[in-house]
Amino acid sequence: RLSPGSPYSGPDLLTGPGRSEGWTESIPVVLAWRANPGRHTSEYIDDDGWKQSITEAGRKQMEKLSEGSWNSSRWGELLDSAEAFSKQSGLSDDASRSELVDIGKNVSLRAGLKTDTSVLLCMLGESIAIVPRDLSKEISLENLLSELTAEGLDVTLTQLGPLS
């Protein structure tokens, strides 16, 4: 996103306050979450301190990301910004979320994918996304599913890609 808000909103998803740029590429994504999460996002998202922290962290990352052309060469930068946002906003300081990220990193390590994957905190709820670090290198994330399930998480393998 280049400006806050969803670029697509309303009943027909035609217009919204945000503006975004991107590219289309098939990218596998493992999503993992607890069946019974601790705090629900609604318990803190309206807190003025959290709003300020999240807004400032988002603004800093958007400033960096809004410069230059958008194509797959920016993937690593996007991953770095996602991690920086979770730290700067304080969301990654939450013990329950931090534990989820650690589980994802340990599972990636055991699967021999530590250097090939990035474990990212999802910003709403308590969940993580595990994605490849290098889009030009084909890796299988399927091995992570059973390991994450063994850790007590619900999981799914999905992908980013062209809109149908």
Language-model features: locations:
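Short amphipathic alpha-helices in soluble, non-transmembrane regions
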Residues: 99, 103-104, 139-152
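Short amphipathic alpha-helix segments
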Residues: 93-114
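ATP-dependent small-molecule kinase catalytic core of the GHMP/sugar-kinase superfamily
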Residues: 1-87, 94, 135-137, 149, ...
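Glycine-rich phosphate/pyrophosphate-binding beta-alpha loops
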Residues: 126
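Active-site signature of cysteine proteases
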Residues: 115, 134-139
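Short beta-strand
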Residues: 118-123
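Active-site proximal loop and beta-alpha junction motif in alpha/beta enzyme cores
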Residues: 60, 114-115
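Short hydrophobic/aromatic beta-strand micro-patches
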Residues: 129-133
